[in-house]
């Protein structure tokens, strides 16, 4: 099986601790590694943010790769500006797959912007999409301390669009499942709860 993993706005190999680097980066990287252990080939597609970084990086083991796809300026950009380049990102993934002669059996997208790209790939490749949001705009707005912290309609509408399109939505917890159902009206038959795993080689009793 070949999986196209999408992490549009942040690279799973990025240094942790920045504004847009943290749990999702670790999740995508470790999930990709573990799928490789099971003999599943994964290409993780992310937007190129540095022209000096090789576009294809073999750093996730078992032949799995991170592919940096040019989409807009190859520099870090604020999230609202990133949305502009999602169509270019999807088009260049399609071109990459065609040039390499790769057929992907499944798309697994992370965060809502990756989901928008996944919808374009799904239309081209006719394969199912599994989506994980990691955070939800409406939930963030509920706990925002100021207007500046609130997410705009472009994100909320984008999330709803992705929820309608996805074949399955992964929730990490029952609480997240409830948020998807009650805040967005997602059918519970579309949601599957898969709790994040633990790397027992790193976390163990002492």
Task: Give a label for each model feature.
Residues 1-21:
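Nucleotide-activated donor-dependent transferases that construct or modify glycoconjugates
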Residues 150-169:
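Membrane-proximal helix-turn-helix segments that form the acceptor-binding/catalytic region
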